[in-house]
């Protein structure tokens, strides 16, 4: 893409620090099944980065399929974080290294997300939430507070049995 077109896709405000190796405005994982083939869905949106944002080295931030992927004022991203298309990261939120956030996730203001977390698509996390490291977020977080949890490595069949037990409690 031309430099002019890239600038249209990414709007950056004042006092931002973006470390080396970071890619901003890449296409998200947008494909539709057509018979036995996958066809690319055009991502025509953009990335908006607020004031006083710091983005660590080696991060990837996908542009929106339409609309915007938004990183609000005061956000701090550690190294090697992936933000998929159409995400919204609220003001003064900090996210630890190697966290992967799937498409259309909305994280509120003043949150802390520990390293090595995974957040599945379309999740909403309210303001003032702490997610401890290595937590896999699969449900909306509607109440402020601290959350943790991550499965211990075990055979999948055993994990399925244990997860059913946890859901019953």
Protein language model regions, located:
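Glycine-rich hexapeptide-repeat left-handed beta-helix
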Residues: 12-14, 18-49, 53-169
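Single conserved hydrophobic/aromatic residue that forms the stacking wall/gate
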Residues: 1-11, 85
